[in-house]
Amino acid sequence: MSLEQLRTGCVIRFPYLWVRQAERGETEGRKSRPVAVGVRIIRPKGEDVLVLFPITSQPPSPDRFAAEIPETEKRRARLDVTLRLWIILDEYNQDTIGRSFYLEPEPPIGRFSKAFFLPLMKEFIARRAGTRGVNRRR
């Protein structure tokens, strides 16, 4: 995968580790799943930090900060249009390009439109204090 392809809104496969799993002492994601690259923080030496949000078919509880993915966006991101899917925005994984044990050398699956994804990122930034992350950086 070209490192330049890892930009805000692109969808990749990643062994996402849920916060609840990390709190129980797990260190590895149980399966590779689609995740959205939310933010790419530019760092020296090409070791940029990615903030990754999970995509799931499990309906989130009402108290979660999540957004259902519309059919048009599922098509753009090349996700299964026959499933109801949500992007979870109150938790995330962080990983570092160039030092990751988890990023696969595959091109992104697809990409969300700016019209759909950027308002979600603005809301994430506004709610950042109430979110939880798992640092996958090594």
Regions found by a protein language model. Give the residues of each.
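C-terminal terminal-subdomain/extension
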Residues: 4, 69-138
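A broad, low-specificity signal marking well-ordered, structured residues that form hydrophobic/aromatic
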Residues: 12, 50, 67, 86-87
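Compact nucleic-acid interaction/catalytic patches
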Residues: 24-32, 38-75
